[in-house]
Each structure stands twice: as C-alpha cells, then as structure tokens.
C-alpha cells in the first residue's frame, strides 16, 4: 500500500498537476445513459458528426448532384419510366420538360432523403389559373407528389378561376395545402427543399405513416405532414407497401417547366436510431452499445493505480455498465484513492483542489441518476469533507 500511495503522489504532482479543462479527466459530465439512451448528456464518447462542406450557392459536399446544367448529368442520372433515355432536354443549362413525353425518373433509387430543386413557371403561364399554369411535381419514390404550379395569388379577391387548395404549389397533392402560399410570380425562379421520410411497415401493416417537410422559397410550408395515402387525382388511395428505395420522379403534366440545380442527400430514417431515442430505441440495442462503450473505457484504466484519473474513469464506466468486474475495480480504486487523500497535508490537499471537486461531482452524477447509493463508497464522504474545508479557506 505504501508503494501504491507513493505512486499516486508522483502521478498527482506530475501527470495531474496541470489545471483540468472543462472536461479534463472527469468523464462524468452530464446525466447518465438510461434504457432508451446509450449516451449521457454531453457525452464525449458519442460519435462526432461528419463534417460536410457547405459552400455558398452550391450543393453540400455529401449531396448527389442530379442536374448541374450539363447533358452529362442528364445522361448519368435520368431516364424515362421504362429505363430508356429521357426525352426531356437541356436548354440554356436548364432541364426542361418535354410536354407529353412522360415523367423523368432518377436512375438511382432513393428512400428517405433531402431533395433540393429550383423551378420556374413559364412566363407565358402568368395568366393561367387552376391546374393549367406550369404544372409539374416532385414525386418522392414515384408515389407521393409535391405539386409544382403557377400559384402566385397576390389578390385573393380577384375574379379568377381559383384552384383547389390541396392542389396549389407546395401542397402534398390531394392531401394537404401549404401552410402559406409562398409562391413567386411566373417567370421568377423558385426553390423547394424537401425532407422526406417514407412510411414504415411491418407484417403488412403501417407502423409509421411517413412524413414530408417542405420549404418553399425558404418558407416552411409543410411541417412534417404525415402521409395519408398516395398522390392521386380526385380519389383517395391508401398507403401501399413498396420497396424501401425507388426512383424519384419529376412530373410531365404537359407544360415545358424548366428545372435547375437538382441534388439529393440520402438521410437515415428517424426510426433507424435504435440506440438513443425516446421514440425508436430498442432496449437490447441500447444495452449492447452501453456495454461496448464501458468495455472500451475500462481498457484505458490502470486498476492498480488508484489516482484521480483512474477513479473518475471507473465512475464513468459504471454510468454505462455495472458488471461485477467493474464494481470490484471501483471498490479497489476508490479505497486506494481515499487512503491517499487522507494521507495528504493541508498544502497537498489544496494542490489537489480541482480533482477533489471534480471527482465529487462525478459521484453526485451517479447518485442523482440512481446508479449508486450515497453511501456505497466511503471515498465520497472524504471528498465532501475535504471540499468543504477547501471552500471555507477561500
């Protein structure tokens, strides 16, 4: 024990003498994992998001560019409904619908995705109303339609043939009008940014109906609308189970609607997160990830050296898992560190102020989250006593 205490002292004044950062050696920073969340609040062990470059006016670096103004991008990414070359044409760097030639389909199949497209109602359609002006649509997976149409309507009292609300621009066609009409006049470019999540099925039944969110010219117009059926005219058509990836389509409704700057980003289903979500977590998956994290953290601990670093390390391990081996290591490390702290002079205690306060906070996180009891480790009482003494001397 004497040699161990001497080793602790050496480590304290060498490796641990520098001031800790906000996290420093203290792994326990926020409330602990639970049955539906494999990670703690503010968990530094949680995987860090991949960096995506977002140059101004250009697609993000992880986007699949479907049309960039070139014939090459058409040849590589688009076909007709039968898989043959699309009859839509490139004109002045725009992807233009050839009326009555049929839909343009992506060659690749996509499921849940973020989709960006810019489109324009031809100027000659400015005085057309109802479903007659610049009619097209974005059709995610070839099943659901976000309407494209000349729907600019600055004068609600004008005596014109009005359209049905669930068929104007940015409507989920035949289901839901946009929250507001964010349309621009014919001849002015418009943008759609669509976030699409497909329905989830199990054993032939819909578990979750799927949602679509639409920003029209930067304005939120569809707020996670739950899909009620397929995109059809005049009749209700219930949701139908389909493949999880299918080509997306641009509609040919007989108007030469031009498009530009089309890109798509594949995104995970919100139901794919089975390890950290109140909505979709599976307890067995959460448990497995917590055990994996605990094992990786435990491998970094030297159970023979009861210093602040290893004590805080084992406390963090316990926040993920309370395997017998981890509990035994915690008892041993805490007892050794407790003995070492009690051997310190007042000057040495003051030199370890940061580690005393930080380790005490770690214990309190575990106690607050009912991972351990308040009296399970005598070390906590020692830390609390020393911390009070140090605060009195301030």
Predicted regions and their residues:
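Carbohydrate-interacting regions of secretory-pathway proteins
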Residues: 19-394
């Amino acid at each position: 024990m004497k040699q161990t205490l001497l080793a602790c002292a050496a480590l304290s004044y060498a490796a641990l003498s520098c001031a800790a950062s906000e996290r420093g050696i203290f792994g326990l920073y926020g409330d602990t994992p639970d049955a539906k969340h494999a990670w703690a609040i503010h968990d530094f062990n949680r995987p860090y998001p991949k960096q995506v470059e977002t140059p101004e006016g250009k697609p993000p670096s992880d986007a699949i560019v479907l049309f960039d103004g070139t014939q090459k991008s058409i040849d590589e990414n688009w076909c007709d409904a039968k898989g043959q070359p699309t009859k839509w044409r490139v004109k002045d760097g725009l992807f233009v619908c050839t009326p009555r030639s049929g839909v343009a389909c992506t060659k690749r199949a996509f499921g849940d995705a973020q989709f960006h497209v810019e489109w324009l109602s031809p100027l000659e359609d400015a005085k057309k109303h109802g479903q007659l002006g610049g009619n097209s649509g974005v059709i995610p997976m070839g099943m659901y339609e976000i309407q494209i149409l000349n729907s600019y309507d600055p004068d609600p009292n004008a005596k014109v043939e009005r359209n049905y609300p669930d068929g104007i621009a940015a409507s989920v066609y035949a289901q839901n009008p946009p929250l507001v009409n964010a349309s621009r006049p014919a001849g002015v470019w418009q943008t759609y940014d669509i976030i699409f999540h497909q329905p989830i099925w199990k054993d032939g039944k819909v578990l979750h109906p799927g949602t679509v969110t639409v920003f029209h010219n930067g304005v939120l117009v569809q707020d996670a609308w739950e899909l009620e059926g397929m995109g059809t005219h005049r009749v209700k058509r219930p949701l139908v189970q389909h493949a999880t990836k299918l080509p997306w389509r641009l509609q040919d409704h007989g108007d030469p609607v031009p498009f530009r700057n089309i890109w798509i980003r594949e995104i995970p289903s919100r139901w794919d997160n089975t390890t950290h979500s109140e909505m979709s977590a599976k307890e067995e998956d959460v448990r497995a990830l917590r055990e994996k994290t605990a094992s990786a953290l435990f491998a970094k601990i030297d159970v023979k050296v009861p210093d602040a670093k290893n004590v805080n390390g084992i406390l963090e391990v316990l926040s993920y898992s309370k395997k017998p081996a981890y509990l035994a290591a915690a008892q041993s490390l805490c007892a050794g560190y407790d003995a070492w702290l009690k051997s310190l002079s007042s000057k040495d205690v003051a030199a370890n102020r940061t580690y005393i306060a930080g380790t005490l906070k770690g214990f309190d996180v575990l106690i607050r989250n009912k991972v351990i009891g308040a009296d399970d480790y005598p070390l906590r009482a020692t830390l609390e006593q020393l911390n009070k003494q140090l605060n009195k001397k301030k």
